[in-house]
From Swiss-Prot:
Residue pairs linked by disulfide bridges in the UniProt entry: none
Record GO cellular component, one term: plasma membrane
GO biological process entries: proton motive force-driven plasma membrane ATP synthesis
Protein name: ATP synthase gamma chain
Subunit structure, as described in the record: F-type ATPases have 2 components, CF(1) - the catalytic core - and CF(0) - the membrane proton channel. CF(1) has five subunits: alpha(3), beta(3), gamma(1), delta(1), epsilon(1). CF(0) has three main subunits: a, b and c.
Keyword Transcription: no
Source organism: Cutibacterium acnes (strain DSM 16379 / KPA171202)
Localization, UniProt: Cell membrane
Predominant subcellular localization, coarse grouping: membrane
Keywords: ATP synthesis, Cell membrane, CF(1), Hydrogen ion transport, Ion transport, Membrane, Transport
Bilayer topology term: Peripheral membrane protein
Function: Produces ATP from ADP in the presence of a proton gradient across the membrane. The gamma chain is believed to be important in regulating ATPase activity and the flow of protons through the CF(0) complex.
Family: Belongs to the ATPase gamma chain family.
GO MF assignments: ATP binding; proton-transporting ATP synthase activity, rotational mechanism
Amino acid sequence: MASNLRELRERRNSVATTKKITRAMELIASSRIIKAQNTVKAAGPYSLELTRALSAVAAHTHEEHPLTSMNPDPKRSAVLVITSDRGLAGAYSSNVIRTAEELTTALQPKQEIATYLCGRKAVQYFEFRGRKVDHLWSGFSDSPSYRDAKDIADHLIEDFLRPTEEGGVDEIHMVYTEFESMLTQTPKVIRLLPLAVVDPQDTPEGQLAEGDPGVGANAEEIFHEYRFEPNPVSVLDELLPLYVANRVHYALLQSAASELASRQRAMKAATDNAEQLIQTLTRQANQARQAAITQEITEIVGGAAALAESAPQE
C-alpha cells in the first residue's frame, strides 16, 4: 500500500511538472500569435496593390510571358509543402502533409512529381519513408522573412523556366495552411506557376481588405492609375518575379500564424488534461492514504485485542 501511494505521488509530481511546461508553451504561443496576426495584416496592403498593378499590366499586355505560359500536356510537376519545424502543434503539419499526399496522388498517374519541402516536419516525414526530396528549406517556419520567401521563389522560378529534360517542371503547386481565425486553420492548395493573374478581390489579402473602394475595380479602371515605363512588357518582366515571391511570403506568414494558433490550442488542451489528471491522481492518492491509515488502525486495534485476550486473567 505504501509503495502504491508513493507511485501515485511521484506520478502526480511528474504530471505537475509537465503541466508547467505546457502552460509556459501555451503562454508563449499566445503572445507570439498576436505578432503573427499583425504581420499577416501588415503584408496585406502590399500584396493587394501588387496584385492590382499586375492585373492592370496584364490587361494591356498581349504578349505571353514565360511565367504565365501554360503547358497543355505537363510531364513533370512540383509540389511545395509548407509545414512547421517543430512539433507540439496538434494536427497542423499532418493536415498539410495529408493534403499534399492527396494532391500528389491526383497528379501522379499523369506526370512525374518533384517534391519541395519547407519545414522539418515535412522533411522528417518524407525521409522516414525513403522518398526523394528535390529541394528543402527549414529553420524559419514560425518567423519567416521576405528573404526566406525570395530564396524559395528564386528556386521555383529557376526550375520552372528550366526544360523538363534538364530537371525542370511544367507546373508548381503550393500546399500551405490559411489562417482564418484562432480556431480555424485550413490547408489550402494553389497553383503557383504558371501564374494566373486573378482579380485582387479573390485573393486572401483582397478579402481581408474588403470594403476598400479600389478592391472591386476592374483592370480597365485600374489602368488609368498607372503609367508603364518604358512599356507594359518590361514592367511585367519585373512584376511577375515579385508576385511569385510575394505569394510565397504571404503563404509563409499565413502558415506561421496557423502554426502558432495550433500550438496554443494544443498546449491549452495538454494543460487542461494535465490538470484533470492531477486531480484524479490526487484523489487516488488520498484514497490510498486513507486506506493505509484505516489498515494501520485496524492492525493496531486487532493487535490490542489479541494482547488483551492473551493476558492472564486474575
